[in-house]
Amino acid sequence: MEDGGKHFVFVHGLGHGAWCWYRVVAALRAAGHRATALDMAAAGAHPARADEVGSLEEYSRPLLDAVAAAAPGERLVLVGHSLGGLSLALAMERFPDKVAAAVFLAACMPAAGKHMGITLEEFMRRIKPDFFMDSKTIVLNTNQEPRTAVLLGPKLLAEKLYNRSPPEDLTLATMLVRPGTNYIDDPIMKDETLLTEGNYGSVKRVFLVAMDDASSDEEMQRWTIDLSPGVEVEELAGADHMAMCSKPRELCDLLLRIAAKYD
């Protein structure tokens, strides 16, 4: 990393992995910055199975460990996509001094003083019964109460997530997605005292609106933003839900502007 370079840490959404950030990571590294894309537990190339990960905390452990391990004085730019916003929130609450800025890309962005699951619950309330299309629900074999995961189907990926992305990225996704859980029934999602103004609320937040998102539409994204007055808002014109694939250059430019603003 060149002198003055930033360290960006990326967190994927449901069913995806570090692999979905490959275009953005390559561009940022070429520009002299450090870029780390993580696999959450039981996602991407992470060795755990979905039935072995019982909570949002366990799922987010790779991010929490990475932020905890940041060098003294190093302040990270965290970037979370979709469900990855919930993992960002946990890291921000726990390590606010280690985060220069948190970027929520068409993401679940909780509000300080409200329960963690508020935006995810609203999203689930808004979607139609057939939203998940050809996705498959998988019953997980656990020692706890029965839980389910979803394997995103090729049709859903094509029509709701990658609808403006290159066909190569859609093909890659159909090969690499894994069953994922949103942890909406995790007790932590109901805790209204978890995210505080003093920690989570003290970190600079930027919400990036994917303007052509066919999954979490603009109205839902604006609803999320309205929960947190004062959050900076940027727009990615022509971006589908997978903005890192459909608009990688524009996303990189925005991230560099954000990183330069919040040091």
From Swiss-Prot:
Keywords: Hydrolase, Serine esterase. One of its GO terms (biological process) is salicylic acid metabolic process. It is an enzyme of class 3 (hydrolase). The keyword Hydrolase applies. Its EC number is 3.1.-.-. Gene3D superfamilies: alpha/beta hydrolase. Pfam families: Abhydrolase_6. The keyword Oxidoreductase does not apply. The active site is at 82 (acyl-ester intermediate), 213 (charge relay system), 241 (charge relay system). Disulfide bonds: none annotated. It comes from the Eukaryota. One of its GO terms (molecular function) is methyl jasmonate esterase activity. Belongs to the AB hydrolase superfamily. This is Probable esterase PIR7A. The gene is PIR7A.
